[in-house]
């Protein structure tokens, strides 16, 4: 009887681990960002390149604004548009989360450490943007996966149209 209970517990544990295991590429695709300081919601694509994950915005859900990177610390880049700017970068997948990345905040022109976790249902990601590597001093940013019915409204950019932060 004791062996049966142990076998059932092991099976239950393994089932739960496998059922909720995340694939590294689960975050790729189109997302709605959290609203910015002007209440614009970006359409963002997360993609994989050389085993790291990156994100750029290319449209707004609720606006046709063309927005420049006016707070970039490099003055010569302030007239460039945010469209196509890779502002979440170098994320590495390990132990069910994406970490060791950076995220640029165009509202203040600063770059922060970034760690990403995916919700159990795969419809939401939480980005922890922090000034310290441990994520203690920072804030959470929530992005929502685009519903499949809305994906055809948007056309991602070609990789040749993207630009790195600096």
Q: Language-model segments: what does each one mean?
A:
Residues 48-50, 57-59, 105, 118-120, ...:
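A mature extracytoplasmic/lumenal domain signature
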Residues 40-113:
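Central antiparallel beta-sheet cores of small beta-barrel/beta-sandwich binding domains
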Residues 7-16:
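Bacterial N-terminal signal peptides
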Residues 1-5:
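Positively charged n-region of N-terminal signal peptides that target proteins for export
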Residues 31-35, 100-106, 127-130:
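Short beta-strand segments that buttress and anchor functional surface loops
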Residues 75, 126-134:
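Short aromatic-glycine motifs in intrinsically disordered, low-complexity regions
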Residues 20-30:
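N-terminal helix-cap/turn-to-beta initiation motif at the start of protein domains
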Residues 132-166:
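Edge beta-strand at a domain terminus
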